[in-house]
Amino acid sequence: MAWVQIRLNSTNEKAETISDYLEEIGSVSVTFMDSQDTPIFEPLPGETRLWGNTDVIALFDAETDMQQIVRLLRQEGHLDENTAYKIEQIEDKDWEREWMDNFHPMQFGKRLWICPSWREVPDPNAVNVMLDPGLAFGTGTHPTTALCLEWLDGLDLAGKTVIDFGCGSGILAIAALKLGAKEAIGIDIDPQAILASRNNAEQNGVADRLKLYLSEDKPANMKAEVVVANILAGPLKELYPVISELVKEKGNLGLSGILATQAESVCEAYQAKFDLDAVVEREEWCRITGKLK
Ligand SMILES: C[S@@+](CC[C@H](N)C(=O)[O-])C[C@H]1O[C@@H](n2cnc3c(N)ncnc32)[C@H](O)[C@@H]1O
């Protein structure tokens, strides 16, 4: 079967609404790509998106009158004269394969690789985390996840407990376990994240060393030598009393999900209790790390 595709440039705030509307008017599949043409796998219901510009790509049956689709998008205010869009005829393809072809093994730091489960690992002697992008955030394609993975790779985790606050797919907790941590604890507000983390941990053979909690069920007085939290700057500041209490004496803290422009305000919130390292930036994002004083 042949298809026709419309690709339009949008913003993180509008992408979801446009996607809903495209499905309403007959699109059989809507996907998002970021500015690097990397598929965005991680949307969570109601979550603020962490990326900047988003391209919305909608697939329609080849018989669809695409000029009518453009008219409807304009009528609804989803397309104006400043919005770039492109319509393309697409030959029959294995869509799933095409999507899978876009997700490649990625290296973080010296030892760590994140590999889609359907690909061969590039280095069997490396620390390989096998991951299938699911509904929960965290494949390593986002700069904030990458910054946290690189930080974990650089730590000596042997025998340590690691808390992954806002675990999403569980990628950071699982990477920590594979990098030598004794145990990891994943916490998230989203039940989907708990499920995804459990599945991914099982796939990586570390489920017996990963405890998972919904935020509301998190035990009191939990502490770890290493705490990593890749959520947004706002919640990181609000959660300062909670997150800082999770870190054991002289323990390490890694924070991301922070725009570079927000680094100063997050540092201000944490510097009373932590000796902070230099902020590391990647694209418009950054990572803040430090040690409990
Ligand atoms: C940006 S994702 C990070 C996922 C993964 N740790 C990574 O680095 O790719 C943020 C995650 O934090 C969770 N989250 C957001 N606010 C939270 C909160 N207040 N408490 C716990 N989890 C939260 C979201 O549900 C989401 O799964």
From Swiss-Prot:
- Does the keyword field hold S-adenosyl-L-methionine? yes
Which E.C. number(s) belong to this protein?
2.1.1.-
Positions bound to S-adenosyl-L-methionine: 145, 166, 188, 230
Any idea which UniProt keywords this protein has? Cytoplasm, Methyltransferase, S-adenosyl-L-methionine, Transferase
Q: Which SUPFAM superfamilies match?
A: S-adenosyl-L-methionine-dependent methyltransferases
Name the GO terms of the biological process aspect.
Answer: methylation
As for subcellular location, the record says: Cytoplasm
What enzyme category does the UniProt record give? transferase
Give me the Gene Ontology terms describing cellular component: cytosol
Q: List the disulfide bonds.
A: none
Question: Member of which family?
Answer: Belongs to the methyltransferase superfamily. PrmA family.
Family annotation (HAMAP family): Methyltr_PrmA
Protein name, UniProt field = Ribosomal protein L11 methyltransferase
Q: Which organism is it from?
A: Mannheimia succiniciproducens (strain KCTC 0769BP / MBEL55E)
Q: Encoded by which gene? A: prmA
